[in-house]
């Protein structure tokens, strides 16, 4: 007989999932100013994405993603959170 409880997996603990963090308003403003763009010009991530949910991102937030790279050490990318 199968148990009705769901298995919960934390995707952030997987070795291939990079570090995700929601930027503060000040940090987001600074990054957008440095890049000379509007938030909507960043690549998007849906608020329903498992990692976005895990870090508590809401539509309008900007997520900083830090990936490890064998060639350049670390690569930082940003995503704009949209509804959905």
UniProtKB/Swiss-Prot annotation:
The record's keywords, sorted A to Z, are:
Cytoplasm, DNA-directed RNA polymerase, Nucleotidyltransferase, Transcription, Transferase
| Reactions the enzyme catalyzes | RNA(n) + a ribonucleoside 5'-triphosphate = RNA(n+1) + diphosphate
Classification via Pfam families: RNA_pol_Rpb5_C
**Could you provide one GO biological process annotation from this protein's UniProt record?**
tRNA transcription by RNA polymerase III
UniProt keyword Chloroplast, yes or no: no
Q: EC no.?
A: 2.7.7.6
* Main subcellular localisation: cytoplasm
Question: What GO molecular-function term can you cite, just one?
Answer: DNA binding
Chloroplast among keywords: no
What InterPro entries does the record tag this protein with? Arch_Rpo5/euc_Rpb5, RNA_pol_subH/Rpb5_C, RNA_pol_subH/Rpb5_CS, RPB5-like_sf
On subunit structure and binding partners, the annotation says:
Part of the RNA polymerase complex.
**What PANTHER family does the record point to?**
DNA-DIRECTED RNA POLYMERASES I, II, AND III SUBUNIT RPABC1
UniProt-recorded name of the protein? DNA-directed RNA polymerase subunit Rpo5
**Organism in which the protein naturally occurs:** Sulfurisphaera tokodaii (strain DSM 16993 / JCM 10545 / NBRC 100140 / 7) (Sulfolobus tokodaii)
Q: What is the lineage of its organism?
A: Archaea, Thermoproteota, Thermoprotei, Sulfolobales, Sulfolobaceae
Gene name linked to the record: rpo5
